[in-house]
Amino acid sequence: MIDQTAFIHPSSIVEDGAIIGAGVHIGPFCYIGSQVEIGAGTVLKSHVVVNGVTKIGRDNEIYQFTSIGEVNQDLKYAGEPTRVEIGDRNRIRESVTIHRGTTQGGGLTKVGSDNLLMINTHIAHDCVVGNRCILANNATLGGHVSVDDFAIIGGMTAVHQFCIIGAHVMVGGCSGVAQDVPPYVIAQGNHATPFGLNIEGLKRRGFEKDTLHAIRNAYKLLYRSGKTLDEVKPEIEALAAEHPAVQAFTDFFARSTRGIIR
C-alpha cells in the first residue's frame, strides 16, 4: 500500500506489498522490497536498498548507497524470516549497512530513535542500538552488540560481537572494543581501556553535581580501589540505593557476559 501523498521517483522500484506512509519521499534509483514498511515523512535520498522484513519509522533521513535489511553475514543463516526495525527521526548517512537478524540471536536487528549513523557505519545481525546515539564514520558493530542510549562511538572503531556499550559512553576513534564498556565511561585504544568519565557529556544532558559526584565515586570503586569486580559490587549497590544514576552500573553488571574493560 502506497499513500497517495508519497513521492516515488520513476527510476525507483517499490515491490507489491510494501507499505509506504504519508509524505514519504523516495528519490532516484532506490529499491524497496515487498515486506518493507516505511513510516510517514521518511526520506530516501537516492540509491537506497531496503529489503527483507524491515520496518522503518517516521521522519528518518536515509542517504545514498545505504543498505537496510539485507541478508546478514552469519554463515549459519539459512534464509529464515528475520527482521530489522528502525525507529523515528534517525539520520542514516551514506553507505550505511544494517543487516537482518538471525534466529540464534532473537531474529531482530533494532535501531531506536534520534540516532546519527555516519558514513560507512556497519550494524551487524542482532545488534540493538538505543536512542540518541552517534556512530561516527566507519564504526563497525559485530553481531549481537548492544549500544545503550546516548552512547558515542568514534570513527573507525570496531566493537567485538556480543559486547555491550553502556549508556552515555564515549569510545574514541580507531579503537578496538573486545569487552563490555560500563555506563558513563570514556574508552580508547586497541584493546580499549578506560580513560575516566564522560563528564562533559553528562553535564550537557543535565546531570546535577551531586549525581556526578556519586558516579565519580562508583568509577573510583570500580577502577581505582584495587579490588575485584565481585568485591566492589556490594559497595556500588549501596551507593546506588542513595543515587539512582549509579543503578546503571549495577544493571550493567547483571547484563555483562564478556567482562568489563580494565
UniProtKB/Swiss-Prot annotation:
Pfam families: Acetyltransf_11, Hexapep. GO terms for molecular function: acyl-[acyl-carrier-protein]-UDP-N-acetylglucosamine O-acyltransferase activity. Keywords: Acyltransferase, Cytoplasm, Lipid A biosynthesis, Lipid biosynthesis, Lipid metabolism, Repeat, Transferase. InterPro entries: Acetyltransf_C (IPR029098), Acetyltransf_C_sf (IPR037157), Hexapep (IPR001451), Hexapep_transf_CS (IPR018357), Lipid_A_LpxA (IPR010137), Trimer_LpxA-like_sf (IPR011004). It is found in: Cytoplasm. It catalyses: a (3R)-hydroxyacyl-[ACP] + UDP-N-acetyl-alpha-D-glucosamine = a UDP-3-O-[(3R)-3-hydroxyacyl]-N-acetyl-alpha-D-glucosamine + holo-[ACP]. GO terms for cellular component: cytoplasm; membrane. SUPFAM superfamilies: Trimeric LpxA-like enzymes. HAMAP family: LpxA (MF_00387). Belongs to the transferase hexapeptide repeat family. LpxA subfamily. Involved in the biosynthesis of lipid A, a phosphorylated glycolipid that anchors the lipopolysaccharide to the outer membrane of the cell. This is Acyl-[acyl-carrier-protein]--UDP-N-acetylglucosamine O-acyltransferase. It comes from Pectobacterium carotovorum subsp. carotovorum (strain PC1).
